[in-house]
Swiss-Prot record:
The keyword Signal appears for this protein: no
Family assignment from sequence similarity: Belongs to the class I-like SAM-binding methyltransferase superfamily. RsmB/NOP family.
Taxonomic lineage of the native organism: Bacteria, Pseudomonadati, Pseudomonadota, Gammaproteobacteria, Enterobacterales
Organism: Klebsiella pneumoniae (strain 342)
Protein name listed in UniProt: Ribosomal RNA small subunit methyltransferase B
Gene: rsmB
EC number(s) on file: 2.1.1.176
Length: 431
């Protein structure tokens, strides 16, 4: 049965759920991938990610090629045409195959009467492709970002915004974290080479390896045994500032899916770690990661604004707060972020971050370390957030990350090869 399923129609349905219903691709895609063969899973992912990466270009092309957009019950056809255009523009799929499979997708979504329309639009694009692309190269949509986000990036990063946008529009690299309790990084790289894969180290993060070409996890030496974990280099940077030690009581707040929880335990296997997240469903990923790596932590569901509900009056030696954020630093990994976020979200997120910071600080021991981290590149959530916190918190001191005038360490996507990420290390003064 699996080989009869039309991939293009599944991709169109997934994109419709993201754009029309505001669902996250990471929630929508896995159930659809279960319907197809292993070799087709990667193509389905490529079609979904690719269309969302280039959505504003595909939208512009459809407006040029069609007299009026498809609406209502025909809306899925609109996204099916996008899938067709994406294949013609960005994949090595032979045009005749891309056309035939996309047109056939109309049958799968129960719109067989529109096969001729889909075929006509895609063939018209083939005829006019060169002229259309020349015109699009001058259009404001060419940056493939919504206007509100482009404006914020230009304001925040007047010198670098074009590099950031370009990085956001690329396929992401695949970074791994070698479990130092099993192998040194060099030892594991030798195993990787034996497996026929090539990897590169990171100059700043001692456990990080970037694959020359992304590979499925089952191809990685010892993945199932916990020798290695998929985690972006920038996320690994948290340990440079947290510096966990054996015997300490450590809180990992907003911990799902558990990448940083397990990194803490790799660096300090005898630490007593509590991992907390508000999302019960995502906590299952924390359990999965702990199990694969053979580790133990206290895992709790809880709201970061109300720590007393899940830890009483307890205080911690170190706290890692990976705060909820706009995720504007990981757009290349999650291109749906561009279309799911709204401008108004940024102020709401900044308010939530401030509330969590305030309440969490009360549970840090005097002399203790709190690392505030986000995968955002917007100052409202990062340097401005920390400036405001330092101004209202007399016993907080910035350490090893920036200056009081410009607090925190900001990684941008691209130049550092990792994702966009922000860290601020705060020490609680002793009385």
């Amino acid at each position: 049965m699996k080989n009869k399923i039309n991939l293009r129609s599944l991709a169109a349905q997934a994109i419709e759920q993201v754009i029309e219903q505001g669902q996250s691709l990471s929630n929508v895609l896995p159930p659809l991938q279960q319907k197809v063969s292993d070799k087709d899973k990667a193509l389905l992912q490529e079609l979904c990610f690719g269309v969302l990466r280039t959505l504003s270009q595909l939208e512009w092309l459809i407006n040029k090629l069609m007299a009026r957009p498809m609406t209502g019950k025909q809306r899925t056809v609109h996204f099916l045409i996008m899938v067709g255009l994406y294949q013609l523009l960005y994949t090595r799929i032979p045009p005749h195959a891309a056309l035939a499979e996309t047109v056939e997708g109309a049958v799968a979504i129960k719109r067989p009467q529109l096969k001729g329309l889909i075929n006509g639009v895609l063939r018209q694009f083939q005829r006019q492709q060169e002229a259309l692309l020349v015109e699009f190269a001058e259009h404001e949509n060419r940056y493939l970002h919504p206007k509100w986000l482009l404006k914020r990036l230009q304001q925040a990063w007047p010198q670098q915004w074009q590099e950031i946008v370009d990085a956001n529009n690329q396929r992401p690299p695949m970074w791994l974290r070698v479990n130092r309790n099993h192998h040194s990084r060099d030892e594991w790289l030798a195993l990787l080479k034996e497996a026929g894969l090539e990897g590169f180290t990171h100059p700043d993060y001692p456990d990080a390896v970037r694959l020359a070409t992304p590979a499925p996890v089952h191809a990685l030496p010892g993945f199932a045994e916990g020798w290695v974990t998929v985690q972006d280099a920038s996320a690994q940077g948290c340990m440079r500032y947290l510096l966990p030690e054996n015997g300490e009581r450590i809180l990992d707040l907003c911990a799902a899916p558990g990448g940083k929880t397990t990194h803490i335990l790799e660096v300090a296997p005898q630490a007593q770690v509590m991992a907390v997240d508000i999302d019960e469903q995502r906590l299952s990923r924390v359990y999965d990661n702990l199990k694969r790596l053979g580790m133990k932590a206290e895992v709790k569901q809880g709201d970061g604004r109300f720590p007393e509900q899940w830890c009483g009056n307890e205080q911690f030696d170190r706290i890692l707060l990976d705060a909820p954020c706009s995720a504007t630093g990981v757009i290349r990994r999650h291109p749906d972020i561009k279309w799911l976020r709204r401008d108004r979200d940024i102020a709401e997120l900044a308010q939530l971050q401030a509330e969590i910071l305030n309440s969490t600080w009360e549970h840090l021991k005097p002399g203790g370390t709190l690392v505030y981290a986000t995968c955002s590149i917007l100052p409202e959530e990062n340097s401005q957030q920390i400036s405001a916190f330092l101004a209202r918190t007399p016993d907080a001191e910035l350490h090893a990350t920036g200056t009081p005038a410009s607090p925190g360490q900001q990684n941008l996507p691209g130049p550092e090869e990792g994702d966009g990420f922000f860290y601020a290390k705060l020490i609680k003064r002793r009385n």
